[in-house]
Swiss-Prot record:
Intracellular or extracellular location(s): Host nucleus
Superkingdom, taxonomy of origin: Viruses
Organism phylogeny: Viruses, Viruses incertae sedis, Naldaviricetes, Lefavirales, Baculoviridae
Any one of the GO CC terms: viral occlusion body
Spans annotated as Nuclear localization signal: 32-35
Chief site of localization: host cell
InterPro entries: Polyhedrin
One Pfam family here: Polyhedrin
Organism: Autographa californica nuclear polyhedrosis virus (AcMNPV)
Keywords: Host nucleus, Viral occlusion body
Family: Belongs to the polyhedrin family.
Function (record text): Major component of the virus occlusion bodies which are large proteinaceous structures termed polyhedra. These structures serve as the protective package for the virus particles outside the infected host and allow natural transmission of virus between insect hosts, assisting persistence in the environment. Forms the paracrystalline lattice of polyhedra and interacts with enveloped virions as well as other accessory molecules and structures to form a mature viral occlusion body.
Entry GO MF terms: identical protein binding; structural molecule activity
Name of the molecule in the record: Polyhedrin
Keyword Heme: no
Amino acid sequence: MPDYSYRPTIGRTYVYDNKYYKNLGAVIKNAKRKKHFAEHEIEEATLDPLDNYLVAEDPFLGPGKNQKLTLFKEIRNVKPDTMKLVVGWKGKEFYRETWTRFMEDSFPIVNDQEVMDVFLVVNMRPTRPNRCYKFLAQHALRCDPDYVPHDVIRIVEPSWVGSNNEYRISLAKKGGGCPIMNLHSEYTNSFEQFIDRVIWENFYKPIVYIGTDSAEEEEILLEVSLVFKVKEFAPDAPLFTGPAY
């Protein structure tokens, strides 16, 4: 007959398996992770209709090397409700000075480089302290070669300049970049033909007006520069071998 009496002398053995015990922190983190994943799935489902639309990327931030060439820095006075011409691209002497600096001093072009795009960048800063206004800008790319732009125009449907006070224009024509090779030989043979036939055949000549939304006459410091987007081709084989290269 079995003995059901309680006696502490009778030993009992218990086997504990670790698979039934989990870290409390891991349990809470896993629950939060599952909740976050479920919320993320719901949020993505609400954005699925946007897959039918396309967004244009900024070519300025694309692949390639940016080479900046500052054209000029000067101060302009702009009256209220008007915009002043700051870039007109007229005169061969302006071309000569600009592109001589571009070729010889500040732009190391070699034959295996390709100019993909040219950006005109206008940086605007107020010269007087404690002024609160926004900059306005308008530009044109396609115009008659004989067109003479006005120095001052009225403000009609302008573009607001961003928070960094920088107005950037891509001068590339529709259809892609500018496959220019052997730039040194083209430039040395005839400078005028190089500008007219090589550069302006592939890029637009811009006309840019700058203004403000201020009710008073404002003094603006302008920095106008060209930024060249250069494509560099990787060599087929390295020129040097060894741990230093």
